[in-house]
Every structure is written in C-alpha cells, then in structure tokens.
Amino acid sequence: MLPLPSELQIQAQNIQQRFYELPAPLSLREEDIAVLVLSDFVSDMLLIHPDWLDELHQQPPQPQEWQFYQQWLSQALAEVQDEAALLAALRLFRRRIMVRIAWSQALETSSTTDTLQQLSWLAESLIIAARDWLYQACCREFGTPCNSEGVPQPLLILGMGKLGGGELNFSSDIDLIFAYPENGQTQGGRRQLDNAQFFTRLGQRLIKALDQQTIDGFVYRVDMRLRPFGDSGPLVLSFAALEDYYQEQGRDWERYAMVKARLMGGAEDHYSKELRQTLRPFVFRRYIDFSVIQSLRNMKGMIAREVRRRGLKDNIKLGAGGIREIEFITQVFQLIRGGREPRLQERALLPTLQAVAELGLLPEQQVADLSGSYLFLRRLENLLQAIADEQTQTLPSDSLNQARLACGMGYVDWVAMNAALEQHMQAVRLVFDHLIGDDAPDIGEDPSHGLYKSLWQDVLEEGDLAPLTPHLDEAARSQLLVTINHFRHDVDKRTIGPRGREVLDQLMPRLFAEVCPRPDANVALSRLIQLLLSIVTRTTYLELLVEYHAALKHVIRLCSASPMVASQLARYPLLLDELLDPQSLYQPLEPSAYRDELRQYLLRVPPDDEEQQLEALRQFKQAQQLRIAAGDITEALPVMKVSDHLTYLAEAMIDAVIQQAWNQMVARYGQPSHLQQREGRGFAVIGYGKLGGWELGYSSDLDLVFLLDCPLDVMTDGERSIDGRQFYLRLAQRVMHLFSTRTSSGILYEVDARLRPSGEAGMLVSTIEAFADYQQNEAWTWEHQALVRARIVYGCPELQQKFDAIRQQILCRSREGSQLQQEVREMREKMRNHLGSKQRDIFDIKADEGGITDIEFIAQYLVLRYAATEPRLTRWSDNVRIFELMANYDIMPEAEAAALTRAYVTMRDEIHHLALQEQSSKVSADCFAAEREQVAASWHKWLVAAPSDV
C-alpha cells in the first residue's frame, strides 16, 4: 500500500476525529483509513451505521459473496408488512452492500471483474425481490393475472445496458423493459382488471419502490426510455406487442441496445425462454451485416457532438478512447457476425473480446490492449463514483479527489495516473479509428502559403488584393480589406490562448481561399465574421473548421445564402456539428422520423435533469431547422415540403414537451385516478393557424388550445393528491413554461393560447364538453373560421374523435350566405386596418389586399358556406387541399382553384426566402401583380357579389 499523499493525510486526520466523536468512539485500523480517505460515501454510511464497521472486521467482504445477496435480502425483507417498510428495507440493504463492495474494491480484495459482477447482482437481487413482493401485493388487491386458459402470467424484466451485461458501475442508473406473456384478466381479486392494467400498476409501483427519493435515499434511478415508443409508449407490453414492434419498427440503435438485454432473475421457465426466442432474430441477423459499421459510426458521431455540446471534458466514458468506444468496437463484431458465430452472442464485454481474438477478427495484442484499458477505465470509473455515490464519468479538477483517484489506482500522484490514462485511451482510439473511425477529415489542399497567408498575417494595401480578387472592383476590394482589418482588430481584443491563435492562423488562409474568388465575397465574409467572433475563443469549433474542409465550405455556402442561417450559427455554434455530414445536412429527416430521432436524441440526457432536457429540445429543433433551411436554400425542398417539415418537427417537439411535463406532474402528484380504467391520458392539444394548416414558417409561433377529459370528482393518486382538473390545468401551464423558458439556447417556440374558448378570459384548459358548448352557442364567426384550420396535434384517440366530430358539426352548420359574407369581410377589414401596410409603394404579402390572408379567408368562407351540403369539405385543414376539394366537388372552377393555389404557394415560397434573408414580408408594390389580380377577382366573386350570383 502506497503512503498517503499530504491531501489524504489531512483527510485521514479529519476522519479519525469524526469517528472518535461518536457516542461510542471508534478507533480505526490502518486499512480502515486507507478505504475511508477514498470515499465520503463510505465514511458517511459508517458514521450513521457504526455496526457495519464491526461487520466489515468480523466478516470481511469476499469476491464471491454476491452469491449470498438474494439470501441476505430475503432475510432483510422477512418482516416487511407494507410498501413503506419495503422501500426502507430495500434502501438500507443497498447502502450496506455498496459499502462492502466499495471496501473490497479499495483494498483490492476483489478484482475489477468481481466488483462489476457484485454491483450487477446486487441490482438484480433488489429488482427481483421488489418485483416479487409487489406482485403478491397486487394479486391480493386485484387478483392474479391469467391468460384465456386461466394460467397465471408473470412480469418479466429485461435488464439493459451494463446491467444486462453484468457490468454495472458503482452509481449507475438501471435501464429496464417490462413484459408479460399474454393478454387476459385478473382472477380472484376484489376487482377485475385486464392484464395490461394489472402489469402497468405493478410496473409503476416497482419503479416507485426503486426510484423514489425518501428519507433513506433511493435504490436506483430507473430509466424506462429504451422500451418500445419510449416514454410515449405503454409501460408494459405483451410478448406479441413486443414482437410486432421489433419486427415492424425496431431501429438500429434499439438493436444495439438489445445485444446486452438479459432477463432479470435468471429464469429458465418456458415464458423466459419464449421471450428470448422472440427477441433473438431481431438482434442477431442470420447473414453478415456490414451496414452496422456506418450505423455505429453515426451513433459515435452523435455522442461526440453531445460531448462538445455539453462541454464534457475529461470524460472517461464518452471521450475519445473512452469506455464507450471499447463497447462500440466489441459490438461491431457482435452485430456483424453474431448471427453466425454463437461465441459472439455473449452479453459481457470481456468474454466477447476474447471470442474476437479466438476467431482471429482482431490481433491478440490489440484485444489484450483493449481488455487492459477496459479494466483500467472501469476501475477508475468505480473509484470516481464511489467518492460520493454519484453518477459521473468526468475526472475531478480539485486536488483532493485527484489524490483519491491516483491513490486508489496505485499511482504516486495525479500526473503519473493521468499519463497512464492517456496511454490507455490512445491505444483504444487507434483501434477504434481503424475499425469504425469517424469519416476521415478532408483537409484538402493547404492554401496557407503566399498571399492568402499574407492577407491574414500582414498589413496589405488594396493593390495587393488584386491578384486574389480580379473579379471585384476597387470599391469592393477596399471594403473587403476594411472588413478583414476590423476583424483582425476585434480578434486582438479577445483572450485567445496560444493553441487558439495557432488554429485561427491555420483557418483564416483556408477561409480566404474559399471566399475571395466568390462574386459575393464581401457579403459572405461579413456574415462569416460574426460567426468567427462567436467561436474565436472556443478552439474546438475552430479546429472543426480546419480539419473538415467540407464543413468550412458548407458554412460559407449557407452563410452566403442566408443571414438567418449565419445568425443562427453565430448564436449557437454547436450547430456547426451538423455540417460534418453533407448527406444529412441537405436532406432533412423523413417527416415521420422526427419523433423517433428526437426520442433517441433525448435518451442521452438524464430524464430527471430538467435543464439539460430543455437545452436538448432546443438544440434538436435548431439542428433540424438548419437542415430544413439548407434543403430550402439548395432547392432540394419545395415550399410545401419546407412547411411540412417545419410542422412535423413542431409536432415532435409538442409530443416531447408534453411527455416531459407529464412526467414531472405525475412525479409530483400522481396521475388522475380515472386513467386507471382507460387508455390514454385524457388530454389533447388542438393546433390552430399555421400549425393546424401545415403551413409553419421558420419563425412561426404555435397557436395551441388544450382540452381535457376528466370527471368532476376525480383526484390524483399520488402522495400529494390534487383535484384531477387542477392537475390538467397545471399540466398545461407546465407545457407553456417548458416552451417559453429562455435557456442559453433560447426559447423553444412562442406559444399563443388565446384562441381557446373566451380567449384570455377563459380557462387555459377546457373540457371537451365546454369546448363543444362554446363553439355551438358563443363562438363568433371568426372563431369558426379559425376552426377550419384546426386539428388535433397531440392527444388520445378518444378525444381526437370527439374533437373531429365537434369540428365537423360546427363547420357543417347551415349559414345564410350574405350574412356570412359580411361577417368574414368585416373581420378581414379589421385585420387589414390593424396589420396592413399603409404605404402605397409597399405590398405586405401576408396582410395586404390580394395577399395570403385574403386567400386564407376565401378558403375559410367556402368551407363555412358549403360544408352544410357537402360535409367532405371539412376533411382537410390546409388551404391547398381545401381548394382541391372545392374543385373536386364543383363548387369552384378547377382553373380558379389551381390559380389561387399557385398564387398562394408562390407567395408562401417568397415569405420563406425572405425569412432566410431576415427580411419582413413587405416587398415592392410591383411584385405579384398577376397573383394579386387573381386573388382580388376571386375575393369579389365569393365575398362581395351576392351569393346567388356566384
């Protein structure tokens, strides 16, 4: 044992003093101090439970004692009579055994592999004991869940990730998936439930037993987001539902996660075997699958971007050469060849690596290096987390904790330990880059010689620019030189370290080589400089632009085309990561993929960290909007598709925000009790305006109205129970808050809820009955116009059906033609007076006569006027398809419908492009003359001429 460094000697003295001051003073042995100086967690636990120290002396921890955990836990739970006692006993047992594991780890009486097995088996024992106790309790209350033949059905639990692989770290959370074999109903209880309801309640109680913070702490943070459909999916699924999901919708990343999946409890009953057999074809393909490499490379790229975004320096899990890269290397072989090589189907990493060596897939020395590095990093991770029983993989910056880790790892000081760490991580990175590697940086031809270098580093005259910019006139050259000199002066005022200056000196000649030959060199450079000033002190992003020449070209192309994009990149430089993959940059996601991509993105953020969740939502939105804008700029996306993508993106964000708000509310109050007897959440959101009409722009706000379906006498089922309708009101308020909170990444969306019944004077959330009553008896014509463009954007099917029926009933109401014309005209006149341009030489594309709003009002009038005789006119909420319906049902001539559609799409396209230029919707009065003439003629025909004349 190495002598303690000075920082730990002081710590030892403090610890001895604290134990001496106990009511029954304890003197510590030398080996006690050797452990206690490394871990505040162990010290604190033994001060609270001094008898545990006697136990450690009398029965020192043994490497294989994990085999007795279930027996010891069974004894600890023998007297438990209720759930409160269960929660207390589970927490106490976990702390006691964690102290023993930390003790054995510090004294190295257990190897690192022993420690990982102990941690994993402890978690499994606690999960299974809690499940079994709660299963019996639920059966007493609700009866035993049975299939159609009366056979009792169990709850099976898949442990995912490191838990599944038997490699859990010291302060890990646990990833679980719940399943049950067959549908059916409970038998023998006080009340009958179907199996889905029974197992959902059991699952909720199990999560609470493990995850809830009490006076005794918690057992494990439980993460259920790896289940099918994530947080928005059922908590528990039948085997058939699981099989359907993974066969029809399973994603690559879910396949990788399933490699380590293991049934908790080691059960060998026929249900367990059936579930394993069901999942196996999804995980391991019968053929050799080389598509895995690119998929894993994409996942690694996402993680690397996350490290940059969250500023994760010194991260031994996610950093280059860290634990995650060793896991990726191993998974490559499992997923490519596992279907044909049973030896590669191991869940644990080290045995899989050994099989890789035996099969000759990697040289033995590389496998030995990877195995050694893995054990080094896992011990370091466990020692780091054992300091305070906190889940972290970031190395400490303070001298005390650095000394603890160096001592625990067997090094004389932090410098020596860090050198060994660097060596291990470099060895891992070499193998990773060879096997998976990021796409090679495309540095391209080095332009830093000659005049481009002089342009940055020397004082040049205008004449010196001529060879570089022969296409520019003198005024343009002069302006270019002024811009460069101002930038150089601004940079000199910034605090840039030597490395930052070195990288900037490499970058600027390359940038000039791309910008100077452009005809718009001045515009491009002025926009790029705003970006450069925002990242000049952040060397990581400068290095990205130096190493990836293609990324630099994309930055120049996009900033030159759009000041909006340039402003976004300058404000949020993390978006530069999106430029590394041109294939995805100019091709936005499939519209149906936004929800799944966002779900995967949020999996990397702790579910209980609201601040990180808010940042992640905003960063995802900005990244996707950048891709949509890139597709728009390059004309890869037509105008209708731009709005479609922006709308699908907004719907994905709404879904995620409501999920986050729901989780927070349920954690605080429980859920409304009426939901136990039904599907869904009794909550829906109506999208109005541009969201409802699939017509969102880059800066559109969201017009939302919230609906609830909850009886009057319902309360929530949590410890802090509140009225059910109060729950939904607070839920809606929480949703509004999550959208509008300003973080370092800005707000998510501006949300306007004023279209709700009675506007700002009305309740934020309406019952579906109150909404129907208001629309039938109190709503103005303009509110019925708004209903034309309304649709459900979030909600359970039952509420959606009710809303659709109300909408159709209102829109199909018989209306007198001339009165409707007058009311629509009057509303339009009010809007024009309020919003329209007052200048005769200006045309506001949105608000002025002959513009987009006139077209929208024509569409709304036609639906309100003719849906009574042709209800199918209410089918769509967007203007383009409304005009299509009008032509199909012979209400409007086909040529007129096509002309109005063309005018509408043309103007919308211009508004998108003006937004990319950060310009308003006001243009010269000469613009869109033909379109405005068509709109004016249609306006007169439908809204001015007597209805009988039409």
UniProtKB/Swiss-Prot annotation:
UniProt entry tagged with the keyword ATP-binding: yes
Family per record: Belongs to the GlnE family.
Protein name per UniProt: Bifunctional glutamine synthetase adenylyltransferase/adenylyl-removing enzyme
Positions of the UniProt region annotated as Adenylyl removase: 1-440
Keywords: ATP-binding, Magnesium, Multifunctional enzyme, Nucleotide-binding, Nucleotidyltransferase, Transferase
Residues making up the signal peptide according to the UniProt record: none
Nucleotidyltransferase in keyword set: yes
Pfam family for this entry, one: GlnE
Region described as Adenylyl transferase: spans on this chain: 449-950
Source species, domain of life: Bacteria
NCBIfam families hit by this protein: PRK11072.1
Enzyme Commission number, as recorded: 2.7.7.89, 2.7.7.42
Record function comment: Involved in the regulation of glutamine synthetase GlnA, a key enzyme in the process to assimilate ammonia. When cellular nitrogen levels are high, the C-terminal adenylyl transferase (AT) inactivates GlnA by covalent transfer of an adenylyl group from ATP to specific tyrosine residue of GlnA, thus reducing its activity. Conversely, when nitrogen levels are low, the N-terminal adenylyl removase (AR) activates GlnA by removing the adenylyl group by phosphorolysis, increasing its activity.
Single Gene Ontology BP annotation: regulation of glutamine family amino acid metabolic process
One GO MF term attached to the UniProt entry: [glutamate-ammonia-ligase] adenylyltransferase activity
UniProt cofactor(s): Mg(2+)
Catalytic reaction list: [glutamine synthetase]-O(4)-(5'-adenylyl)-L-tyrosine + phosphate = [glutamine synthetase]-L-tyrosine + ADP; [glutamine synthetase]-L-tyrosine + ATP = [glutamine synthetase]-O(4)-(5'-adenylyl)-L-tyrosine + diphosphate
A cellular-component GO term for this protein: cytosol
